[in-house]
């Protein structure tokens, strides 16, 4: 993709209403408006074009992307890490298989609220995969979201990281949107 095409995509992005996506989590595809979904596709195309043209996509000079997986994963974990790297974020992997991770304090009674705030220090984004139990994954993501919002509001966190659903019990928005963009192209 050439620079002219990239500029045209950026211009078309300006015509979309995606204001609600700023400082907002991305949990479920059906919670987003058509403009927000279209804007997400445009940003993906712009990033692809920049990458193909060997133009840096770094938006961050430093920062963290937290990869919180409560299930096994290869493709999704690697894709999230690659996306964070493309934007200039270092990735910290926090793997908590079904909440019983003996390497964390969860096994010793640490609450979701405590864990969420602890892993959120200096974080810009948290990608969560929790798809093992119906009725649990999406609820867990909302609990984490509420905890980091509370931590930010109360001054525990200097910034509030955005949460991205990397797969839950009711939706896999990153995969759905990647599949749709593949079909579109």
Predicted feature residues:
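Positively charged, low-complexity intrinsically disordered leader regions
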Residues: 2-78, 82
């Amino acid at each position: 993709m050439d620079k002219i095409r990239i500029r045209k995509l950026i211009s078309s992005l300006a015509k979309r209403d995606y204001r609600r996506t700023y400082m907002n989590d991305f949990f479920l595809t059906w919670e987003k408006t058509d403009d927000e979904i279209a804007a997400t596709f445009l940003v993906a195309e712009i990033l692809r074009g920049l990458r193909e043209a060997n133009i840096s996509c770094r938006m961050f000079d430093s920062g963290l992307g937290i990869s919180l997986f409560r299930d096994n994963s290869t493709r999704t974990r690697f894709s999230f890490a690659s996306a964070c790297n493309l934007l200039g974020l270092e990735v910290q992997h926090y793997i908590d298989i079904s909440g019983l991770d003996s390497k964390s304090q969860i096994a010793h009674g640490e609450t979701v609220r405590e864990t969420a705030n602890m892993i959120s220090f200096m974080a810009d984004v948290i990608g969560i995969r929790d798809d093992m139990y119906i009725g649990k994954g999406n609820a867990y993501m909302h609990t984490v979201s509420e905890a980091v919002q509370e931590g930010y509001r109360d001054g525990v966190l200097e910034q509030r990281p955005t949460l991205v659903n990397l797969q839950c019990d009711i939706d896999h928005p990153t995969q759905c949107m990647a599949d749709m963009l593949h079909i579109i192209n």
